[in-house]
């Protein structure tokens, strides 16, 4: 479920040495499955473990995961990186904002998953987002842009050169294109 690099495991062991005996780490997602999802790691003393929690054993400690967070931590990875600028603990959880869908899920569910997990994190840097409104009978994904994308002069390039190209590569034979359903009235919220 969660991968923790050797360097991150060593970092956690060092931190846990200074805690009460049998303290582990808790890995969690606040607001899982939403655009506001945030992942975290905290100390987890023995009396804070709930019966429904799951344990993932590592060298010298366990990662405790609550049942609400578990599906959103699939494929999560924790690493500890050190360089000349210092050191940093990173937690990447690609499914935190949206639960990973099965390969046999509908085309619309799989496209929406790609939009939420791969496309929207990039658009969020400019305050933008995109959602799927429908897939037409001839395989065209109709997309609704919002936030900073609404009124942005670069939306056509983003759609054709970025999003459509990515979706056609991921769903060959299922999708034939992508179109914008958004009314693009320029306003103060627009990125460009």
From Swiss-Prot:
Cofactors (names): [4Fe-4S] cluster
Details of cofactor binding: Binds 1 [4Fe-4S] cluster per subunit. The cluster is presumably bound at the interface of two monomers.
A biological process from GO: protein maturation
GO MF annotation list: 4 iron, 4 sulfur cluster binding; iron ion binding
Subunit-level organization: Homodimer.
HAMAP family referenced in this protein's UniProt entry, alphabetically: Fe_S_biogen_NfuA
UniProt-listed Pfam families: Fe-S_biosyn (PF01521), NifU (PF01106)
Family: Belongs to the NfuA family.
Species of origin: Tolumonas auensis (strain DSM 9187 / NBRC 110442 / TA 4)
Domain of life: Bacteria
PANTHER family, per database record: FE_S BIOGENESIS PROTEIN NFUA, IRON-SULFUR CLUSTER SCAFFOLD PROTEIN NFU-RELATED
SUPFAM superfamilies: Fe-S cluster assembly (FSCA) domain-like, HesB-like domain
Physiological role: Involved in iron-sulfur cluster biogenesis. Binds a 4Fe-4S cluster, can transfer this cluster to apoproteins, and thereby intervenes in the maturation of Fe/S proteins. Could also act as a scaffold/chaperone for damaged Fe/S proteins.
UniProt-annotated binding residues for [4Fe-4S] cluster: 149, 152
UniProt-recorded name of the protein: Fe/S biogenesis protein NfuA
UniProt keyword terms in alphabetical order: 4Fe-4S, Iron, Iron-sulfur, Metal-binding
